[in-house]
């Protein structure tokens, strides 16, 4: 999988990464198990090959990155044959693969430095001194130039 250019290009977007941080790994993996049970476990899943959205949840992106998104990918990349209901060991294998990928993304995000803080410039107002924010009456508004 790591040699596949298609699979390597997947990364968590900012919304999915925030969701993972907010909900936590345990909750997201519980979602993964639910998705696997409903969308992949049946012998003939509904809309097989199209049942996993491309974005919107960290698990969806992880499924595409780990080739656990449909039964044909499971067969080709994970060696799990089509045509039978997934057993407990196969389901656990899929969720574990998703978890490893999510953990690698979480660690990748921690290793990167946050971008520098953006400075916000005050708009130029003719006749006002932007450096002097103390007004004559003791307020905090800009004072007109004399």
Model-identified regions with their sequence ranges:
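Immediate flanking context of iron-sulfur cluster ligation sites
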Residues: 47-67
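Long, highly charged low-complexity segments enriched in Glu/Asp and Lys/Arg with interspersed Ser/Thr
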Residues: 89-116
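Iron-sulfur (Fe-S) cluster-binding segments and ferredoxin-like electron-carrier domains
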Residues: 72-92
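Short flanking/linker segments adjacent to small metal-binding domains or redox-active Cys/His motifs
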Residues: 106-131, 137-146
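Core of compact, soluble alpha-helical bundle domains
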Residues: 1-36
């Amino acid at each position: 999988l790591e040699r596949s250019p298609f699979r390597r290009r997947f990364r968590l977007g900012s919304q999915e990464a925030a969701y993972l941080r907010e909900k936590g790994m345990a909750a997201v993996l519980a979602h993964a198990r639910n998705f696997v049970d409903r969308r992949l476990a049946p012998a003939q899943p509904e809309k097989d090959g199209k049942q996993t959205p491309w974005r919107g949840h960290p698990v969806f992106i992880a499924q595409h990155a780990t080739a656990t998104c449909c039964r044909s990918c499971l067969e080709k990349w994970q060696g799990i044959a089509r045509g039978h209901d997934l057993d407990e060991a196969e389901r656990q294998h899929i969720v574990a693969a998703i978890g490893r990928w999510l953990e690698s993304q979480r660690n990748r995000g921690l290793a990167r430095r946050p971008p520098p803080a953006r400075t916000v410039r005050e708009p130029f107002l003719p006749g006002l001194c932007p450096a002097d924010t103390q007004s004559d009456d003791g307020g905090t508004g800009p004072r007109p130039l004399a």
